[in-house]
Amino acid sequence: MEMICVLFLSLVPAYSRGQGVYAPAQAQIIHAGQACVVKEDNISERVYTIREGDTLVLQCLVTGHPRPQVRWTKTAGSASDKFQETSVLNETLRIEKIQRLQGGRYYCKAENGVGVPAIRSIRVDVQYLDEPVLTVHQTISDVRGSFYQEKTVFLRCTVNSNPPARFIWKRGAETLSHSQDNGVDIYEPLYTQGETKVLKLKNLRPQDYASYTCQVSVRNVCSIPDKSITFQLTNTTAPPALKLSVNETLVVNPGDNVTMQCSLTGGDPQPEVLWSHSPGPLPPNSLVQGGNLTIWRIRVEDSGYYNCTAINNVGNPAKKTVNLLVRSMKNATFQITPDVIKESETIQLGQDLKLSCHVDAVPQEKVVYSWYKNGKPARFSDRLLITRNDPELPPVTCSLEIIDLRFSDYGTYLCVATFQGAPIPDLSVEVNISSETVPPTISVPKGQSTITVREGSRAELQCEVRGKPKPPIIWSRVDKETPMPSGTMTVETYDGKLRLESVSRDMSGTYKCQTARYNGFNIRPREALVQLNVQFPPVVEPAFQDVRQGMGRSVTLRCTMLKGSPMKVATSVWRFNGTLLAQPPAEQQDYSELKVDSVSRETSGSYECSISNDVGVSACLFQVSAKAYSPEFYYDTPNPTLSQKQSKNYSYILQWTQKEPDAVDPILKYRLEVRQLAQRNTIQTFIPVQKMEKGLLLEHILPNLKVPQSYEVRLTPITSFGAGDMAARIIRYMEPINYPSPTDNTCRFEDEKICGFVQDKMDNFDWTRQNALTQNPKRTVNTGPPTDISGTPEGYYMFIEASRPRVTGDKARLISPLYNITAKYYCVSFYYHMYGKHIGSLNLLVRVRNKRAIDTQVWSLSGNRGNMWQQAHVPINPPGPFQIIFEGVRGTSYEGDIAIDDVTLKKGDCPRKPIGPNKAVALPGSGVSAQHGPCLCGPLTFFLYVLLR
């Protein structure tokens, strides 16, 4: 009777009782993966506790129609941990090897365009315990008029952890407690970063010289083991001390081989010596051997501070620093400064004049400047003064000042910078002083004040400088506080030209050129402005638009220019399926339009509008048709799987709505294509449509699907125009379990939810769901089933693996959902596979939930039972709500895999045929014997089922 009803429903499409199934998104976050929980009462939707290094798996379960899209975001993390928003179609967020900085609050945002988005959050708490750090500090104080000294030792133990760690101090094997005697004190210091506990040993006694251990624990949260560190305190314990073989400032020549020796002069236990460099790491041409640091063929860029540090966790680390300077000279510049007192900007006879010379050198203070006039050393006099370090100019700048300039002072002055006694080439700069030496002027050449170029081409901005000498030109942007294309804020040129390669629209704007105050006159800079205009092709919208309209109706297409340079439509060209359309000349405006008078099969297709602004062309693309939009599959169907008890087939309730049905002509029928995954054959049928409106839920039953196969379903609407857009989805088999009312339902483990069974968190390892296709090809031979009870490679079963790291006696427990009592007697039936010479035990337990949970073993089987599936029937009579537990126990070695399949919980008696190890066991508190007679539950259930139908 049931098969006839299912076949009848599969031929006629059904419709929902109401209209408008469009619903806003709803979301719920669940966590999977390697979660661990501190306490049972902390299990909630909003907190996910996980161990650092494990895999985080969050699932955002969504409902709503159309199917919502999911986006994950994160807050409350480190600034360095930027979590990017992504669209995850499978609603799953997975983070491998999660780190502590990735803890925080994660948000799932689901939206489908109906109502407001659904936003849910969950806090991820990453648990960790670092290795503790133990440091020792000693103080010595005079007591009673300096007759003797009192020595106090502080052992400081610090650790980073989450949750906060518990500290245990031990002296040898003895656990120390706070104030257990006058010589011991344990306290937590104020204003410490991380967690810290201090063990204070007052007025050190002989027995205090011992081995001390700091043990830290997070109480086995997430199975994180305790950690500890030990220190041996002796009467020779002392902090490290260092000495250097070189001065704290070391000046060397480029190309030298440099060795710096850092020697230990004290410390117990033996300190560790480390070398470091700032800024940056040690140079690649260096080698550290013990306390010696050697740098071969040293370069200028190897200059910096080299730090030698000795650490033994007693007292503060000892540190010595060497400031290593590699001699160098570069960038010789000069300045001509007219009479400052008279605020002059030109050279005039009778006024003062100052010539300045500067080089960038290391070390700067070791540079020696020499001045020459017309090739001869300048003679110093009352009118010719030399200042070695001019306070008005950059540090270590040498100035030659001429008082009361005369005609005889005209000539060529040469400034030479040297490192005396060092093999560094001299640098020199020449300054010519004459009546022709005049300050600079700057201007833009005629016709060059505005430069217009196309995007991607080369641009050249130019300013002309007149004067003697000609200073460099410094370019910068005026209208935007952005760097130049080179990445710097200014660019220096010597020919007055700023060359820009491959310009972009962002480079448009005003540029300033100004004279530098070096290699010329040290006066107020002269400035000029140049405007750069970058022309670029138009930006249009829409780039693509799907236009749907019923046959015979008109539609107007518009392509709008959003921006461009120049901002005007020069020409617009329309094409239909690549063929040029005649279009009247458009007026000067920022858009172009085309009207399609009547949509038909002949006028349906691709329309392209190309808009030009004489610089480039951009196009709008319109796809015009009377095709129907795609169906919208309904994913929130309750219990979509219908099982067929007489065969291992199932039916599936497929539901959908039609997107925008009124946008085009009425839908006449649907083409349905069903294909089993991994196969090519497709079954095609047509579903007629009797009624259609927006939001109406359509329904069709897919019959004779094979358990546990998955199928691809394609659904295409058909109108008088023809086939519309196709929608596809995957149909996956789900166990039709309506627990907690399990009567006559069989769990075949074909669905990932495994019928609500869960792994016990208190066992040693887990059961695994697998089939012949997913099992490990390297699995141990001579044990375990090749397939499930059905014999198909796709069929799933639950399995325990006995190979390493499992050891003898390890247990894996699989716990069912909680079942409410609706009958006096139940029968648990299941298939088991126990093949291998090292088989352990398979136990069935019943957990009764009354005032407290009580686990009772009701069935057990051990040893090799052959390479076959066998069935067991176990009667139970629980006195209250109960769960069943399958417990697999690992045997003596690796050939001991155990599997179970097809678990059924039925009301009433078990079959009366004898079952080897089966034995009825009365549960505590039941008050009845294990043997019982038949009951009328089966017929009564069938009668109620018929009434409900």
Swiss-Prot record:
One Gene Ontology biological process: neuron migration
Keyword Cell membrane listed: yes
Glycosylation sites: 42, 90, 235, 247, 257, 292, 307, 331, 432, 577, 649, 820
Disulfide topology: 60-108, 157-214, 262-308, 357-415, 463-513, 559-609
UniProt-annotated location(s): Cell membrane
Membrane topology category: Lipid-anchor; GPI-anchor
Classification via CDD domains: Ig, MAM
All copies of domain Ig-like, residue ranges: 24-125, 132-230, 240-323, 338-432, 440-531, 537-625
Keyword annotations from UniProtKB, A to Z: Cell membrane, Developmental protein, Differentiation, Disulfide bond, Glycoprotein, GPI-anchor, Immunoglobulin domain, Lipoprotein, Membrane, Neurogenesis, Repeat, Signal
Pfam families with a match to the protein in the record: Ig_3, MAM
Residue ranges of domain Fibronectin type-III in the record: 637-737
Subcellular location, principal: membrane
First and last residue of the signal peptide: 1-18
Domain MAM: 745-912
Lipid-conjugated positions (GPI-anchor amidated serine): 926
Record-level GO cellular component terms: plasma membrane; side of membrane
Tissue expression as described in the entry: In the embryonic brachial spinal cord, selectively expressed by medial lateral motor column neurons, some populations of dorsal root ganglion neurons, and interneurons.
Propeptide residue interval(s): 927-949
Primary role: Required for radial migration of cortical neurons in the superficial layer of the neocortex.
Quaternary structure (record): Interacts heterophilically through its MAM domain with proteins in axon-rich regions and through its Ig-like domains with proteins in differentiating muscle.
Protein name: MAM domain-containing glycosylphosphatidylinositol anchor protein 1
Organism encoding this protein: Gallus gallus (Chicken)
